[in-house]
């Protein structure tokens, strides 16, 4: 979008941002074979409800720059439109139940920044945002495949992908060097060896095997898939009872032997705190640990020693990453649907999105392909590992369908608990898999 002149009138701004923008780009269409076609980047004509108050529910931040620029961009939108934005920030695990309650009762926030396949739990309650999604995709190089998988149902966009608070490997460079790994391992086999060597040197690792919304689920699914295992097959039938799952369990148990005590009960903040306290040498996390160290004058030596690497690749031989995935969706009970759609369009235009990315040093990886070229990914080489999170991401029900089943399996921590039961609670592999299989079958029957 053309940068706004400070003297532009509110009416001019709305007219320009709603109808006058045009350009050419390639849009990854919501449905497979159309993916290469070019569409004109013409913004939808949205008649914003006069004096609208937009109530937004979103997850609380782990890096202050996220909130600072989010709020600043909200004030820009308010000034330009004459509307008001009220943001409510909740802990990550509290967003899903509150959004579900709002969907059930038909009241509450107008717009929610939720997780993964939340919109698939109540698609009939949501405003169609196809016009906004196709405009943004056309203008900014198309959407990554995972965005289309999550955002499109029955040929229409039910949510706007905001991006992924990605997770990669965070490690202490000097300790890895001492262990003989000047280049951090890229495969699960070498990764396990490295972590065990670090533990033997007095530098244990730490990975959440508790009910951790982000770090626990993401690492468990990534690890499972990397061995060629999955919760279900393409048809949504339970597939967890397999030799590949047993290999994944054994690999995780080896890794668990290198972990600091207590990981089986860790939630999302625990590995951040342990890493910053120099109690662990390796974990999976967003860029928030590095961000926190950089911002603290007392932790500058630690910040210099923090490096990032992509999640290790398992026997399957290719990236199998899962990341937290943030989707914005609008409830039909809102009285201001056009304001809500315009707000999302505005927030993902480059003029707002790029400063937001810069302020949080890439904590959220965008789903629009052109945003892989933002300077934030190369201005500090330590940010680069997070650039392709959405590009390399699978969906949480992979390789099966997205829907209530995949959402329930993740929300109930079925995969995380399977690993924790085997690694930390003395359960046999057969028993851990059996319990997981029953939970998966129940979830997909709902």
Can you describe what each PLM-predicted range is?
Residues 47-48, 84-85, 177, 393-446:
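Conserved C-terminal helix/tail region of periplasmic/extracytoplasmic solute-binding proteins
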């Amino acid at each position: 979008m053309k940068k706004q002149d400070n003297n532009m009138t509110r009416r001019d701004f709305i007219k320009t941002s709603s109808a006058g923008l045009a350009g050419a780009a390639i849009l990854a269409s919501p449905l497979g074979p159309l993916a290469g076609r070019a569409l004109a980047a013409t913004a939808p004509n949205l008649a914003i409800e006069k004096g609208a108050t937009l109530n937004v529910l979103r997850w609380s931040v782990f890096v202050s720059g996220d909130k600072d620029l989010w709020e600043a961009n909200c004030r820009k939108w308010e000034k330009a439109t004459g509307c008001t934005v009220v943001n409510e920030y909740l802990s990550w695990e509290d967003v899903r139940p509150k959004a579900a309650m709002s969907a059930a009762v038909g009241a509450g926030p107008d717009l929610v920044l939720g997780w993964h396949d939340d919109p698939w739990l109540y698609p009939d309650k949501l405003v169609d945002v196809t016009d906004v999604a196709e405009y943004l995709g056309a203008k900014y190089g198309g959407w990554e495949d995972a965005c289309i998988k999550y955002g499109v149902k029955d040929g229409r966009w039910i949510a706007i992908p905001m991006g992924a608070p990605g997770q990669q490997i965070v490690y202490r460079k000097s300790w890895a060097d001492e262990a003989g790994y000047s280049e951090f391992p890229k495969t699960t086999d070498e990764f396990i060896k490295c972590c065990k060597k670090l533990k033997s040197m007095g530098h244990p690792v730490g990975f959440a095997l508790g009910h951790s919304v982000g770090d626990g689920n993401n690492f468990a699914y990534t690890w499972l898939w990397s061995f060629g295992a999955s919760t279900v097959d393409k048809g949504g039938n339970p597939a967890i009872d397999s030799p590949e799952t047993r290999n994944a369990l054994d690999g995780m148990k080896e890794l668990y032997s290198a972990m600091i005590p207590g990981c089986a009960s860790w939630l999302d903040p625990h590995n951040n705190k342990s890493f910053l306290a120099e109690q662990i040498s390796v974990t999976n996390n967003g860029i928030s640990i590095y961000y926190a160290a950089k911002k603290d004058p007392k932790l500058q030596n630690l910040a210099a020693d923090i490096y990032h690497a992509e999640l290790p690749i398992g026997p399957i031989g290719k990236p199998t990453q899962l990341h937290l995935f943030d989707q914005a969706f609008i409830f039909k009970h809102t009285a201001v649907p056009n304001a809500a759609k315009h707000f999302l369009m505005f927030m993902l235009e480059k003029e707002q999105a790029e400063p937001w990315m810069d302020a949080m040093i890439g904590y959220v990886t965008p789903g629009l392909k052109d945003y892989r070229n933002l300077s934030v990914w190369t201005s500090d080489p330590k940010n680069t590992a997070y650039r392709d999170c959405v590009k390399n991401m699978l969906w949480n029900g992979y390789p099966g369908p997205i829907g209530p089943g995949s959402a329930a399996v993740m929300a109930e921590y079925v995969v995380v608990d399977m690993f924790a039961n085997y690694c930390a609670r003395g359960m046999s592999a057969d028993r851990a898999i059996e319990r997981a299989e029953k939970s998966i079958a129940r979830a997909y029957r709902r």
